[in-house]
């Protein structure tokens, strides 16, 4: 039977529940257990797909086309299990499901209430995410509850997991609570009172934590941990210090050395081999011992919040490790880039233009793509980054004056990028939309395969077929492809059903490394394997750097 670990948070948000949950899952997986993770988000949005990146950060897309919380990206990078739609749900989804059941008459005329109907629905969703009662059932499901204890929004979730723990019976569930222990500089000490209070709030709800993870900017001394233990009704050996580290890949070892996985296995009566964290140790060693540095610039619309590009940042770092270098990423707001100042990009070894929505900052991205093309700087455009590269090429090489996307200029005489009206979804179903369709849930989403043209840079990287995850509404307009090809643009991958453009590039005889992809390869990168596209991109940046040094040496 599947056992559950419920992870809650207190005092403040953004303490790292996702990293803590993923790290615990990684340790349990190293013990030979089949593990999955589920994220419960207490907001009323059906999913984060229409939320601003400045508010929510990145929207992580699963293979089956779910737009989910960025924590699912952490989960996939830490464990072998691939996340699905069932691994993330929101209050909006819960209420939507409950109201649909009420309309169908499923409740047989009863008054529909938060308890038991909403709480039962939450429990059903959690079990579905764990594959409960199916051949896909896991040994342990780690359930992360978003928000903080004390929030009104979180109460139905906390009540649901309290009830679920009771129904599961002894030794089938455990509670891990993450709290904050601030360092007060004026007093010169760590303060445990916030953690004492949040543990008390949790008990008032009816939940007793089995382990407390105490976040601080430094290791918490034994005396403070004993004090927390006394006032939180948690054994001192279950009060675990979680301090700031220079890489998140140190966290599994940190938690293991303090016995968190042993505590959980004892609580759940799980008999397993010892944890084997060698690959984590090797990973940390690799990050700490680079053989060089490479500098890339990301020209984006949401650079004020680095979480907006979380998976992309990680994918670049993974590729750096595979090339044995440390990648330094500079972020430049595309709104600030103009033809007059675009030469500031010359100091970088490569240029990356990520995805985005809306017209703001687009001309700056087009300037960046033009600079990379004309100055033979390695360029990788992702989603919108591929589209702006296509627009730039159309304007300045193919002679299509005023070329644009219908997203930015619906009346453009040369709409080289246009709205997709029909496509095959990740589940194989045919989807349609038009300009009047809702924004939410109407994009081309999830993993889809494309055929790669032989003799191209894309084929060197991917081989015959590329399967990547998508999240977009607009595509290269098929009516302009012949014109673009004749001007020298290489269309190196097409979708298998609709023959939509998936990858564009320049011939290596013209540019050493210039590529735009319509999909989001960052969602498939892991610290163990990296990702072939990003590995090739960083290698190109290194080659560009070496060529620049050689020119300076000659001069």
UniProtKB/Swiss-Prot annotation:
Positions that bind L-glutamine: 356, 384-387, 407, 473
Quaternary assembly: Homotetramer.
Full protein name: CTP synthase
Chain residues that bind ATP: 14-19, 71
Glutamine amidotransferase type-1 domain: residues covered: 295-547
Organism placement in taxonomy: Bacteria, Pseudomonadati, Pseudomonadota, Betaproteobacteria, Burkholderiales
Recorded catalytic activity of this chain's protein: UTP + L-glutamine + ATP + H2O = CTP + L-glutamate + ADP + phosphate + 2 H(+); L-glutamine + H2O = L-glutamate + NH4(+); UTP + NH4(+) + ATP = CTP + ADP + phosphate + 2 H(+)
Protein's organism: Albidiferax ferrireducens (strain ATCC BAA-621 / DSM 15236 / T118) (Rhodoferax ferrireducens)
Gene: pyrG
Pfam families: CTP_synth_N, GATase
